[in-house]
């Protein structure tokens, strides 16, 4: 099954502590996505001079399950569900389910 959400998509978070936040998808890892400036966690790291890493508390984005985000429709500004439409030449095209307009050109 092809992913409905890809890197670079603008998404809105549906559930959790960051509900309602919008951001860009930085990375897709299977059924999880990493959204910029959302689900930020703190990790305590040890210094590693060989790798050039200074120790301390580092903030970074944690992954969110793909079912907890929706793609933002530029026309409405709201998060909407996405489906697929198969073209005559066999290509799959992502479309918004509410309006049927194409997400990819």
From Swiss-Prot:
Keywords: Ribonucleoprotein, Ribosomal protein, RNA-binding, rRNA-binding
Transmembrane segments: none
A GO term from the CC aspect: ribonucleoprotein complex
CDD domains attached to this UniProt entry: KOW_RPL26
Gene3D superfamilies: 2.30.30.30
GO biological process: translation
Single GO MF descriptor: structural constituent of ribosome
Record's keyword annotation contains Ubl conjugation: no
Subunit annotation: Part of the 50S ribosomal subunit.
HAMAP family, A to Z: Ribosomal_uL24_B
NCBIfam families on file: rplX_bact (TIGR01079)
Protein family (similarity comment): Belongs to the universal ribosomal protein uL24 family.
Function field: One of two assembly initiator proteins, it binds directly to the 5'-end of the 23S rRNA, where it nucleates assembly of the 50S subunit.
Protein's name in the database: Large ribosomal subunit protein uL24
Species of origin: Xanthomonas campestris pv. campestris (strain B100)
């Amino acid at each position: 099954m092809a992913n409905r959400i890809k890197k670079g998509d603008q998404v809105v978070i549906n559930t959790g502590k960051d509900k309602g936040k919008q951001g860009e998808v930085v990375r897709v890892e299977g059924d999880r996505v990493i959204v910029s400036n959302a689900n930020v966690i703190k990790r305590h790291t040890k210094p590693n001079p060989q790798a050039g890493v200074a120790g301390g508390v580092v903030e970074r984005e944690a992954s969110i399950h793909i079912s907890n985000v929706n793609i933002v429709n530029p026309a409405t500004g709201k998060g909407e569900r996405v489906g697929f439409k198969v073209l005559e030449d066999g290509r799959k095209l992502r479309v918004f389910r509410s309006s049927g307009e194409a997400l990819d050109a």
